[in-house]
């Protein structure tokens, strides 16, 4: 995760030497913390998932899994917040505009295929979901592909909403950037955190309902796919989880070995 964060930041904004050093120092500390405290949690999480493969998925279980994943992400974000805050304060106006421009361009590039006609939007949804599915269970059967296609047809379009939210995010983030030297660290970090998490409270009731409907449709698709898995697909899914569990355990044990050697 640390190298991914480093490359992601550098893709969006050109940092000066002191900022690069700050970023690398913060990410080195994050790497040690993440390896020491989080990887064992990930291993336990994946291990628990592997024990549930023979049990039917339920909507409640999917909601819990989603919340668990979100919580893992928030724990990492909270650890990174002081470093994010330092880097945020150090940016000048030119760097800030570059950051906003690149974030907006990335968002528009992602949304562009979904802004075409309905047929193209459905095709893109189906293509992206199928690609992710292949990673976990292999090639979907004809029946499973039909499930994915029907799911893609039923989803509400949200690309325009995403772009509108990005535009509002840019305004809110720029307001905070302009105030960055006038705010105390706690207030600034709290507002930064809220920006990074995303605020859905400002959505209209119609938009909230559309997102909720899409989430329910996706949960239903996942439940239907799980019930339709062949023995070969179940085996691939199980092996994927075993591999992730082994990787997390191995990486966390490397930290334990280093700690014992010191």
Predicted regions, residues:
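Extended, structured, electrostatic nucleic-acid-contact surfaces
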Residues: 1-12, 82-85, 116-136, 215-223
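Short, contiguous, well-ordered secondary-structure segments
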Residues: 63-65, 69-72, 111-114, 118-121, ...
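Amphipathic, charged-and-aliphatic alpha-helical interface segments
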Residues: 27, 150-153, 217
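N-terminal Sec/ER secretory leader and immediately downstream segment
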Residues: 1-90, 94, 98, 102, ...
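Mature extracytoplasmic or organellar-lumen-exposed domains after removal of signal/transit peptides
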Residues: 21-23, 102, 125, 150, ...
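A cross-kingdom marker for long, charged
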Residues: 6, 166, 170-262
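Extended amphipathic alpha-helical interaction segments
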Residues: 85-204
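Short, low-complexity cationic-aromatic patches
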Residues: 13-21, 73-82, 92, 137-146, ...
């Amino acid at each position: 995760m640390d190298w991914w964060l480093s490359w992601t930041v550098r893709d969006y904004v050109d940092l000066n030497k002191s900022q690069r050093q700050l970023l690398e120092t913060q990410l080195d500390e994050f790497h040690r913390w993440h390896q020491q405290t989080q990887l064992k949690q990930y291993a336990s999480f994946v291990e628990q998932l592997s024990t549930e493969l023979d049990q039917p998925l339920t909507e409640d279980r999917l909601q819990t899994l989603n919340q668990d994943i979100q919580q893992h992400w928030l724990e990492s974000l909270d650890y990174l917040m002081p470093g994010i805050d330092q880097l945020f304060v150090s940016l000048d106006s030119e760097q800030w505009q570059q950051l906003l421009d690149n974030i907006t361009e990335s968002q528009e590039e992602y949304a562009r295929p979904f802004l075409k006609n309905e047929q193209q939007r459905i095709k893109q949804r189906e293509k992206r979901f199928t690609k992710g599915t292949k990673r976990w269970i292999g090639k979907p059967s004809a029946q499973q592909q039909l499930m994915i296609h029907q799911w893609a047809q039923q989803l509400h379009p949200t690309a325009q909403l995403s772009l509108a939210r990005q535009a509002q995010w840019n305004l809110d983030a720029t307001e905070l950037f302009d105030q960055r030297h006038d705010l105390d660290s706690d207030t600034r970090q709290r507002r930064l955190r809220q920006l990074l998490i995303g605020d859905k409270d400002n959505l209209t009731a119609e938009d909230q309902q559309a997102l909720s409907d899409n989430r329910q449709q996706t949960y239903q698709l996942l439940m239907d796919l799980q019930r339709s898995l062949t023995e070969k697909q179940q085996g691939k899914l199980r092996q994927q989880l075993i591999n992730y569990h082994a990787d997390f355990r191995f990486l966390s044990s490397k930290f334990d070995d280093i700690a014992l050697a010191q």
